[in-house]
Amino acid sequence: MSEPIEWLEDGTPYSPRFSDRYHSEHGGLEQARGTFLAGCGLPQAWQNQPQWRVLETGFGLGLNFLVTWAAWRADPHRPQRLHFVSCEAWPVSAADLLRAAPIDSTLQSLAQQLAAQYWGLLPGVHRLSFDGGQVLLTLYIGDAQALLRQQQPTADSVYLDGFDPQHNPQMWDIHTLKAVARCCRRGTRLATWTVARGVRDGLVQCGFEVQKVPGVRPKRDNLQATYAPRWEPRAGQPVLPDATVAAPARCLVVGAGLAGAAVAASLAHRGWQVQVLDRADHPAAGASGLPAGVFAPNVSQDDNLISRLSRAGVRITLNTLAQLPAETRGTDWSACGTLEHRVDGTTGLAWSDGPGLDWSRPATPAQLQANGLSADTVACWHEHAGWVRPPQLIAHLLNDPAIRWRGSAAVAELRRTTVDGQPLWQALDAEGHVLAEAELAVVCAGHHTGPLTHAHWPMNPLRGQLAWGLHAQAPAGAPWPPQPLNGNGNLVPRVPLQDGAGWVLGSTFERLKTALPPSPDDHAKGLATNQAKLHALLPPLGAAMDAAFSQAATAPDGPVRTWAAVRCGALDRRPIVGPVDSVRQPGLWLCTAMGARGLTLSLLCGELIAARLHSEPLPLDAPLARALSSERWLGYEPQ
């Protein structure tokens, strides 16, 4: 349930929890612009910068974010990317955000975009994306002090905001102020509306130079401060080892699947010149070339690490898909929702109410009926899920003027060298010819990754076989569901394929098998496995398709066809993302082992690499970032 708001007679939003107004009866717009934006020297301070990072201690109704976003849009000298990190322990509803937004047409438009993404705010970190990914809002849902200590973002400006210190003292106490100070660099400017003595003294104690300035009504005075400690702040243990680069340069990416395309796109958006190399003559030639796949959150009764990772990944996948041309919706992807048939008989949900229901909830009787499932079937409805055609998504990701694609370029070795005094990585073919060179190299080559990184990673090849077909050849009257199903396998019931509307079902998990095409015996086993999956997912459709499956072995172009590729998975079933060895092999990174979750996690992993290289706020909870990091296999243990 969202935080309740009362609306006073003068239209001011009021918090029953804190017995305080969200802003004065004069409105919050003047305060947002005068106290916070101008109080931090914005927009002048951010002009002509590659990025600017604003930290806010209380998101509230989002007005400070909207005003900052609008100012960024209006500034011709704005930074290339605006990061806005905001803490909020008690998020309100999207409807209340819209109701509280100023009448100003520009801010109303921005508020509507914000409200459209303001859902599913379970405790933790949520990355929202606007203006093609140039404006990134990272929400910390929960206790501000704890999350700031956990995430350790770097701030260029700080909006110290929240309910009155008398009503919400924890937000202003010395422990929270210390957590804020740890996020500041020398010169970071801070602004707030309160001049309470305890706040002033606390800021001074934390290393800020503080001054009173004329206030924005109804306040006589406001407070401004600059982080300028007279001591050298003690460096704590970072979330992950520092990997910040001085500036974007050149990057070579080995592998043109989902992981490679995601890394290339994320870095190109930050100003890198990227060359993508692949042994095949076209992108998405490996495991990412499947005709269609499902993206959906994982659910577990203890809301385990994979479940939390999957939600972070789905949100970024949705952000990316929403930025694609409008004509791709329904042809290359669809966020139509997914029904998960819980064949183990449990819902798997870690919640019965609250924001988790925005993500996943028990399926309704009407949904079960629409899918041809009996009323006693246990199933979940994933509202923010759907299907994607991976080759088309990869093509869109690589369609950037800063990305060059080169096929038929099998990389046999990556060599560290120096050219004109500049350390570089060179990609060599089997004859020793240089295919590409760059300051940064990222290996996204699936089960071929190990030899290229001169290291052994705990990964295994994992062959998968799909079944697919065209509706024109399917049995007449087959009871196809209205949307994808997942569970023990997944089914995309209707997707535009090259030869017409089709369906895709899969997939098998054949550990340590790499032969392509599969042997006749393995092919037959794969068909039987996928047929059994269909019976488990949707028994009526499984029965209707039995005859078609029986023809598959002797009619390769018949109603049921097959597709196979080799995926790569780590022993702990999580991607491996990060530097190979920052001391002995600086500038060599990897992003691999997506397993069966490439559509859910690849784009998140690309953003994680970009965040680490550019000292950006992490796009997910720090413990989850560590769970993905290559350092987990290299002995890094944060304190």
UniProtKB/Swiss-Prot annotation:
<dbReference type="GO" id="GO:0005737">
    <property type="term" value="C:cytoplasm"/>
</dbReference>
<dbReference type="InterPro" id="IPR023032">
    <property type="entry name" value="tRNA_MAMT_biosynth_bifunc_MnmC"/>
</dbReference>
<keyword id="KW-0819">tRNA processing</keyword>
<dbReference type="InterPro" id="IPR047785">
    <property type="entry name" value="tRNA_MNMC2"/>
</dbReference>
<keyword id="KW-0963">Cytoplasm</keyword>
<dbReference type="InterPro" id="IPR029063">
    <property type="entry name" value="SAM-dependent_MTases_sf"/>
</dbReference>
<comment type="similarity">
    <text>In the C-terminal section; belongs to the DAO family.</text>
</comment>
<comment type="similarity">
    <text>In the N-terminal section; belongs to the methyltransferase superfamily. tRNA (mnm(5)s(2)U34)-methyltransferase family.</text>
</comment>
<keyword id="KW-0274">FAD</keyword>
<dbReference type="InterPro" id="IPR017610">
    <property type="entry name" value="tRNA_S-uridine_synth_MnmC_C"/>
</dbReference>
<dbReference type="Pfam" id="PF01266">
    <property type="entry name" value="DAO"/>
</dbReference>
<dbReference type="GO" id="GO:0032259">
    <property type="term" value="P:methylation"/>
</dbReference>
<dbReference type="InterPro" id="IPR008471">
    <property type="entry name" value="MnmC-like_methylTransf"/>
</dbReference>
<dbReference type="GO" id="GO:0002097">
    <property type="term" value="P:tRNA wobble base modification"/>
</dbReference>
<dbReference type="InterPro" id="IPR036188">
    <property type="entry name" value="FAD/NAD-bd_sf"/>
</dbReference>
<keyword id="KW-0560">Oxidoreductase</keyword>
<feature type="region of interest" description="FAD-dependent cmnm(5)s(2)U34 oxidoreductase">
    <location>
        <begin position="254"/>
        <end position="639"/>
    </location>
</feature>
<keyword id="KW-0285">Flavoprotein</keyword>
<keyword id="KW-0511">Multifunctional enzyme</keyword>
<dbReference type="GO" id="GO:0016645">
    <property type="term" value="F:oxidoreductase activity, acting on the CH-NH group of donors"/>
</dbReference>
<feature type="region of interest" description="tRNA (mnm(5)s(2)U34)-methyltransferase">
    <location>
        <begin position="1"/>
        <end position="228"/>
    </location>
</feature>
<protein>
    <recommendedName>
        <fullName>tRNA 5-methylaminomethyl-2-thiouridine biosynthesis bifunctional protein MnmC</fullName>
        <ecNumber>2.1.1.61</ecNumber>
        <ecNumber>1.5.-.-</ecNumber>
    </recommendedName>
</protein>
<dbReference type="GO" id="GO:0004808">
    <property type="term" value="F:tRNA (5-methylaminomethyl-2-thiouridylate)(34)-methyltransferase activity"/>
</dbReference>
<dbReference type="GO" id="GO:0050660">
    <property type="term" value="F:flavin adenine dinucleotide binding"/>
</dbReference>
<keyword id="KW-0808">Transferase</keyword>
<keyword id="KW-0489">Methyltransferase</keyword>
<dbReference type="InterPro" id="IPR006076">
    <property type="entry name" value="FAD-dep_OxRdtase"/>
</dbReference>
<comment type="function">
    <text>Catalyzes the last two steps in the biosynthesis of 5-methylaminomethyl-2-thiouridine (mnm(5)s(2)U) at the wobble position (U34) in tRNA. Catalyzes the FAD-dependent demodification of cmnm(5)s(2)U34 to nm(5)s(2)U34, followed by the transfer of a methyl group from S-adenosyl-L-methionine to nm(5)s(2)U34, to form mnm(5)s(2)U34.</text>
</comment>
<dbReference type="Pfam" id="PF05430">
    <property type="entry name" value="Methyltransf_30"/>
</dbReference>
<keyword id="KW-0949">S-adenosyl-L-methionine</keyword>
